[in-house]
Amino acid sequence: MLQRVDDTRAFAFDPRGRVESTETPLAPRPVALAGLRLGILDNSKWNANKLLRGAAEALSGEVAFAAVNYYVKHSFSKDATPELLARIAAECDIVLTAIGDCGSCCSCCVRDSIALERLGRPAACIITTEFVKETQLTLVALGMPGLRPVVIDHPVSSITAEEVALRVGQIVQQAQVVWTA
C-alpha cells in the first residue's frame, strides 16, 4: 500500500520489483562428445517425444555416445523433481531437454536445464522462437545468463512429420555447440 508520508513530496510505487540473483557459472564443458552419456529429458509436451527421439537418433549418427538415456517427466508445467534431476546427473554427462513452446513449459524446461547445470551437467534446453525473450529473462533472474538455449521454429505442437524433421536438424546443429562452447 502506498502511503503519503510528506504532503510536500509525491511518491511513486514501482510494481515491477527488483530481481536480484547471484550469477552461477555454467557446468564445465567437455572438449569432445564422443564416449559421453547423453541424457534426454522429455517434458511430455506434444511432439517433444518426436523431436527428442529424432534428435537423439541424428546426434548418435554424428557422435559415438557411450549411452543414450531417456527420461520423462509427466507434467510439462512443473519442474522436474530433485530425485529425477539427481538421477539424470548421476547417469549422464550431457543433457538435452524439451520442449519450451509455451509460457509454463518454457519456464520449467529452462529451470530444469539450470538445475542440471548446477549439478555439473551441460544442458541444452530446446525452446521455440516465440519464447527467446522470456527464456533470457528467466536465465538472468535465476543467475545463469550465460546458458544458451537451442532455438527452433515455432510452433511445435501442430506440425507435420516433415516439419519435425526440419526442427530436429535445428536441434542437432545447435545442441553440440551448447554442450561444448
Task: Kindly give the residue locations of the regions a language model identified.
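Helix-enriched interaction subdomains in cytosolic or periplasmic regions
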Residues: 1-17
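Structural motif
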Residues: 23, 75-86, 164-165
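Glycine-rich phosphate/diphosphate-binding loop of Rossmann-like nucleotide-binding domains
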Residues: 36, 40-57
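Short beta-strand elements in bilobed, periplasmic/extracellular small-molecule ligand-binding domains
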Residues: 61-74, 146-153
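Short, well-structured alpha-helical segments in soluble
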Residues: 81-93, 112, 171
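Active-site-proximal loop->helix
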Residues: 110, 118, 132-145
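A charged, well-structured terminal subsegment
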Residues: 150-181
